[in-house]
Amino acid sequence: MIKPLGDRIVLSIDQPEEEKVGGILIANNAKEKPVMGSVVAISETSVGDSKAPKSVKVGDKVMFDKYAGSQVTIDGEDYLIVHEKDILGVL
């Protein structure tokens, strides 16, 4: 598993179910990017003098900005590495 640095958090992306309109599948490039995921790993380091505790913990389901982070694939699994500020809320 990847170990995030700084204020970064690793998310497992929740893929939405197949969308159909009138029985027709919508093309992948026409779908909205996912905005929900589960926290997989949290950085143990801090940025600058910020020693504040993280606002999320491993296992939390979160919503994030759809244009946030860097998507990576590790062992066939897709993950998103985001800054803590890109997480909009905990579900």
Swiss-Prot record:
Location relative to the cell: Cytoplasm
Annotated Pfam families: Cpn10
MF terms (GO), sorted A to Z: ATP binding; metal ion binding; protein folding chaperone; protein-folding chaperone binding; unfolded protein binding
GO cellular component: cytoplasm
SUPFAM superfamilies, per database record: GroES-like
InterPro entries given in the database record: Chaperonin_GroES, Chaperonin_GroES_sf, Chaprnonin_Cpn10_CS, GroES-like_sf
Entry keyword set: Chaperone, Cytoplasm
Keyword Cell membrane found: no
Record's keyword annotation contains Nucleus: no
Transmembrane regions: none
GO biological process: chaperone cofactor-dependent protein refolding
Similarity-based family: Belongs to the GroES chaperonin family.
Function, as annotated: Together with the chaperonin GroEL, plays an essential role in assisting protein folding. The GroEL-GroES system forms a nano-cage that allows encapsulation of the non-native substrate proteins and provides a physical environment optimized to promote and accelerate protein folding. GroES binds to the apical surface of the GroEL ring, thereby capping the opening of the GroEL channel.
Subunit relationships: Heptamer of 7 subunits arranged in a ring. Interacts with the chaperonin GroEL.
Protein name: Co-chaperonin GroES
Organism: Oenococcus oeni (strain ATCC BAA-331 / PSU-1)
